Amino acid sequence: MEQIRYSSRRLAEVLGLSVRELAEAEERGAIQSTVPSGGPTQKMSYSMRDLSSARAALNRVPPRRPLRRQLFLNFKGGTGKTSVSSSYAFRLAEMGHRVLVIDLDSQGHASKCLGVCGEDAERTLFDAIIKKTPVETVIVKTGMPGLDLIPSNLTMSTIDLSLMPLAAREFRLRNVLKEVEGTYDYAVLDAPPSFGLLNLNALMAAHDLFVPVLADFLSFHGLKLLFETVQGLEEDLQHVLDHIFIVINAYNATYKIAKEAKEALEKHYPDFLLKQVIRQCTKFAQASSEGIPIFAYDSESKGAQDIQAVLDEVQGRIGAPVRLKAVESA
């Protein structure tokens, strides 16, 4: 991701400045570009490190907060969960928050979406959870300052079996994350579409659960299973999630079946379904193929706009937990 560049207009937008204010900051020397100039006719561009330096110089760093653990999970695959979670995490970091992404899927798709080849990783979460390797030795940097990653690869495929005989096996991930409290503002966990001990760990560690779904009726089956699982954790292990956010992904309002499915979700899950949908957008796939989040690929795309709107809605809801008992039976 280190090749990502910001135009003056985009840098100003990310920093919450007008283009004129940005120009004035440049004149004062508060903002500088480290990107080599291509000549006097080439427009100024900035690297992600320039963005980080400018944010610090202009005192536009958001207040630090206690670690917020946010899990992206759906037992049904093919919902675009990883594209959403990686772009969400990138945008948080772009806004100046300290973010740790934890790739729980042995396929390593979240790692790839952030420009990291999981196959090359010397350590994964397996080492931290099973071998009790210090978590700071497992974390790797991405190209975005403030956005770090615990990568994943095929070594994670046996983690459920390795967890089975361990004491307090449901709490291993929560204990690992205690090691990074104070270092990060957000931990974004991207989980595989399955239920096992690793995902149980993820649920037990999470404050917030994000459930990306498609606007089709197959999504209801996966949601029912997931909500039953979460309710079981409340009853058996006394773990209550602060929030559950269902977000409709790849939505196409021109499809009758999509509109009907959305209406059904609104009926059965009114307290959990986000009002903002993520519209169908081919830029997600194109960005993933290049190993960058959608904000870096095309910040003006429908997908980027919708992820930002989801983030804004979520920030507005955090602080007012909605309990699972509010769900109407589907």
Question: Model-derived features: where do they sit?
Answer:
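P-loop NTP-binding core
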Residues: 2-14, 24-330
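Key DNA-contact positions within bacterial/archaeal DNA-binding proteins
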Residues: 20
